[in-house]
Amino acid sequence: FLSLIPHAISAISAIANHL
């Protein structure tokens, strides 16, 4: 699970950056 956290943060960051 912990290995998924950086990917989730990356995805959220990309979405936030797109907004």
Swiss-Prot record:
Cellular localization per UniProt: Secreted
Record PTM Leucine amide, positions in chain: L19
Tissues where the protein occurs: Expressed by the skin glands.
Keywords assigned: Amidation, Amphibian defense peptide, Antimicrobial, Secreted
Any single GO CC term annotated in Swiss-Prot or TrEMBL for this entry: extracellular region
Chief localization: secreted
TM helices/strands, residue ranges: none
One Gene Ontology biological process: defense response
Family under the similarity heading: Belongs to the frog skin active peptide (FSAP) family. Phylloseptin subfamily.
Role noted for this protein: Has antimicrobial activity.
UniProt name for this protein: Phylloseptin-J6
High-level lineage: Eukaryota, Metazoa, Chordata, Craniata, Vertebrata
